Amino acid sequence: MMENIIYKGFEFNLIYRCSYSSLFYNSNLEMVLCIADVEYIPIENFKTIFDSISELIEKHSIKHLLFDKRNLRTFHQPSMEWYFAVWKQSIKEKGLVNHYKILPDLEWFVQAVNAGKHEIFKKYNSNLLNGIRVSYVDTIEKAIDDILISTNN
């Protein structure tokens, strides 16, 4: 399973792969890349992927997560609700509070994400993300730049 990718001179090691996504880790940046490899991830598989990140944080220092959704073509509200209301809350306790997202270049997908967040905040609370920083970026390199700037300040 030794497959590595390099962004901005940082080597990311493949640490988990399933039929739906790949997880890569870089210890210097304390960052995990979660890359959706397919157009749709069923909710049970979606939960397994993110539960794997929860397990990884027990073994590795992870302060930054980038979820690259560019390959997704299906928006699934129940997955997003679980991700926001359950998973992000549990992972916040473990110190993973910096989340980066790359959305598909599809206007309807962006609108669905915004509408989905609105519904989640209405159902749970608008301060659901207190203590969690979410940044939307266009590239993995942009997220790395942001991490480097924040660690040098």
Residue ranges, per PLM feature:
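Amphipathic, Lys/Arg-enriched alpha-helical "gate/interface" segment within cytosolic domains
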Residues: 2-153
